[in-house]
Amino acid sequence: VRSRMLLFAASPLVNGNEWYKDYRNKAGELVFNPTYDPNKWVKAAEACKLCIDEAEKAGYKLYVETGPTGENDPFMSTYNVHIKKWSEGNREITFPVTKGNGYFDFFLYGASTREFSGGGGQGVYQGLVDAFFTRRGLPILEDESYSEKGFSENVDKRNTSWSYGTGKEGEITAAGIYKMYCNREPRFYISVLHNEQWHIGGKRNTDFYMDGKDGGPSHDAPWSGYLVRKRVDPSANPKEGSGDYKNRHGALCRLAEIYLSYAEALNEYSIEKGTYTANQKEILKYVNLIRERAGIPEYLSLIHI
């Protein structure tokens, strides 16, 4: 909590923001500093590093699943970090919320499609779809292979045991899929349920077209054409009462967040002080730990950050 609050205090939102220059508490004291203070990034970085060191000493670490030859399986790693508990080997959740997540709780109900008695209300907006990297670890507008025109001609097969793309292990997208959804990073497929993606519980592809089985104009359909997939068991079929509806933890904080917060704070301070050479290796270490787990190429320099 301390590291998160110090990161907030260092951010331009409240660090020297003229919008809050006269914002005072009941005692008449300024709540936020009226002039920008780069040293707040140092305090944030120190708090994040302390949190990392203490967490790792206590046995916390990034959740990673490996394939048969010991290599990282980014699909299963980024999927199960949101599903598995401490007792199942997940040592990443530093601040869990042990609240029920049964079908009639709003999240799971809203993330299910209409034909299977779901509300279809947990939609994903296009901006988030666009924010995920391509398979090469690049923003979509920086990857010349990215296209929003036409449909794929081939099946995208990768080295993973994940089978929730087409219903077959290792197949991420089938032929005939809108190219916007092709050749994206693993976290995209774990997080977003898009059109023509395999629905394990329904044993068919999703149909988010207007007047489709999962689409509008019904109010029980996502108007963006996407549903959230993260933390939802793809086998869930509320209509038949099948699939996995067991309670799952929520995560107020994961070790991955602290890694990125530490890198951000150290990077921002380096911008002010011109200490890229001294801090580059440390910054990239923690950013690349996240990228490696996600199955995308590492950053080689700070020019990308």
What is each stretch, according to the model?
Residues 131, 140:
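Extended substrate-binding grooves/exosites of carbohydrate-active enzymes
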Residues 1-123, 146-303:
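Acidic/polar-rich alpha-helix caps and helix-coil junctions
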